[in-house]
């Protein structure tokens, strides 16, 4: 059985996903396309627009509406069932999925990449995820990214427990894609567009970039590209590239617009209070920062710091290998020998590695300020458990 290729469209509310979808459908050149449109509201407005403007044939094609939920979580099971139905139908050459604007792309991609043992559905038998597309509104990106608002603030959340920040959602969509479409380019100046594109290229160096007006993109740009690879997409974010490959080559374009990046790496722990205060006053021209942090007051835990615009989070992700019992340490070292490359005789794998991406970054000042957050010699020799800890995590021990 021939596998049906699938393209997934992601992008924040109002970026132009439905307009792009209609543009593709109007120029599909004989392809029989099944379309799934996901909308958070009870009435699927986007699906109505696709029906009106997409020109889908009632006999050869199909539009599936998935409303009142999100395919990356609450409607994930429904997505599995619908895609399996469409694939087994045998009438379609292609499936295009338009995610809701608040959907994160990774869970959707996982739906096509792994077997769902609970439901007994294996989409990898019927489908091939071909392209992950993210649409960015060139006109409103900075407004949304720097707003400091959450989805709850804008009444766009999945529920009261959905505390996601808009900047974090935008980053999730940008950092996991094969094709990034900068839409509404007619609404910004060429200089603004150049700067935005160069910042986004720094955040997502792997993706193909396409500029568009009113979602006007050639179908071959997002259909049958063969670009998707889960492992590559997962490691494609700019901050990961910087950590794994050291300093990437800085192109003349990024230098022209003052866009730069650097890695801060230290083998001493931060004093939690000083680091917490620094996070609170991080320079506003840092667009993205992410990495692993070693804090003295949580000496056994590797902490993940993630910043996107005004949103900053820091939380434990795992135990340091050096904090594990000796037997477990040896097992991990055998399974992941690359750990030994960074292993320190005294501290083991404990270290801080942070990537900073931004415009007109003052690397020297940021480095100096962070160094002042490290333990002093006196503090290093004292009892770390007595340090004040401003990070109020509810740790599930």
UniProtKB/Swiss-Prot annotation:
Function description: Zinc chaperone that directly transfers zinc cofactor to target proteins, thereby activating them. Zinc is transferred from the CXCC motif in the GTPase domain to the zinc binding site in target proteins in a process requiring GTP hydrolysis. Contributes to optimal growth under starvation for zinc.
Single Gene Ontology MF annotation: GTP binding
Loss of function: phenotype: No effect in wild-type, but required for optimal growth in strains lacking the ZnuABC zinc uptake system.
InterPro entries: CobW-likC_sf, CobW-like_C, CobW/HypB/UreG_nucleotide-bd, P-loop_NTPase, Zn_Chap_cDPG_Synth
Family membership noted in the UniProt record: Belongs to the SIMIBI class G3E GTPase family. ZNG1 subfamily.
Enzyme class: hydrolase
Domain CobW C-terminal: 259-374
Superkingdom of this protein's organism: Bacteria
Record keywords, A-Z: Chaperone, GTP-binding, Hydrolase, Nucleotide-binding, Zinc
Signal sequence range: none
Descriptive protein name: Zinc chaperone YciC
Residues where GTP binds: 11-18, 73-77, 183-186
Induction: Repressed by zinc via the metallo-regulatory protein Zur.
Location of the motif CXCC motif: 70-73
Pfam families: cobW (PF02492), CobW_C (PF07683)
EC number: 3.6.5.-
Record field: catalytic activity: GTP + H2O = GDP + phosphate + H(+)
């Amino acid at each position: 059985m021939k596998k049906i290729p699938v393209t997934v469209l992601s992008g924040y509310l109002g970026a132009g996903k439905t307009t792009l979808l209609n543009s593709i459908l109007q120029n599909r050149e004989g392809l029989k396309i099944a379309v799934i449109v996901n909308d958070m509201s009870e009435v699927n407005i986007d699906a109505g627009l696709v029906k009106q403007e997409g020109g889908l044939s009632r006999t050869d094609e199909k539009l599936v509406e998935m409303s009142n939920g999100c395919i990356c979580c609450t409607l994930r099971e429904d997505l599995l069932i619908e895609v399996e139905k469409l694939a087994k139908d045998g009438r379609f050459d292609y499936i295009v999925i338009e995610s809701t604007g608040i959907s994160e792309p990774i869970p959707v991609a996982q739906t096509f990449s792994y077997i769902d043992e609970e439901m007994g559905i294996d989409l990898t038998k019927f489908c091939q995820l071909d392209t992950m597309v993210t649409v960015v509104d060139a006109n409103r990106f900075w407004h949304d990214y720097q707003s400091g608002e959450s989805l709850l603030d804008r009444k766009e959340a999945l529920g009261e427990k959905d505390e996601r920040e808009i900047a974090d959602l935008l980053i999730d969509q940008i950092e996991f894609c094969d094709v990034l479409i900068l839409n509404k380019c007619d609404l910004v100046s060429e200089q603004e567009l150049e700067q935005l594109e160069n910042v986004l290229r720094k955040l997502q160096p792997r993706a193909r970039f396409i500029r568009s007006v009113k979602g006007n993109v050639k179908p071959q740009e997002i259909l049958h590209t063969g670009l998707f690879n889960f492992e590559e997409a997962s490691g494609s974010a700019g901050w990961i590239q910087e950590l794994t490959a050291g300093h990437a080559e800085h192109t003349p374009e990024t230098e022209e617009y003052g866009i730069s990046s650097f890695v801060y790496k230290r083998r001493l722990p931060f004093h939690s209070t000083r680091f917490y205060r620094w996070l609170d006053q991080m320079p506003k021209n840092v667009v993205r920062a992410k990495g692993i942090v070693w804090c003295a007051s949580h000496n056994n835990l590797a902490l993940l710091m993630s910043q996107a615009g005004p949103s900053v989070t820091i939380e434990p992700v795992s135990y340091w290998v050096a904090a594990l019992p000796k037997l477990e340490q040896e097992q991990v070292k055998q399974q992941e020998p690359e750990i030994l490359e960074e292993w320190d005789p005294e501290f083991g794998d404990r270290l801080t590695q942070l990537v900073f991406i931004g415009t007109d970054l003052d690397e020297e000042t940021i480095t100096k300020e962070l160094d002042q957050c490290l333990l002093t010699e006196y503090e290093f020799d004292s009892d770390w458990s007595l340090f004040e800890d401003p990070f109020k995590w509810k740790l599930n021990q």
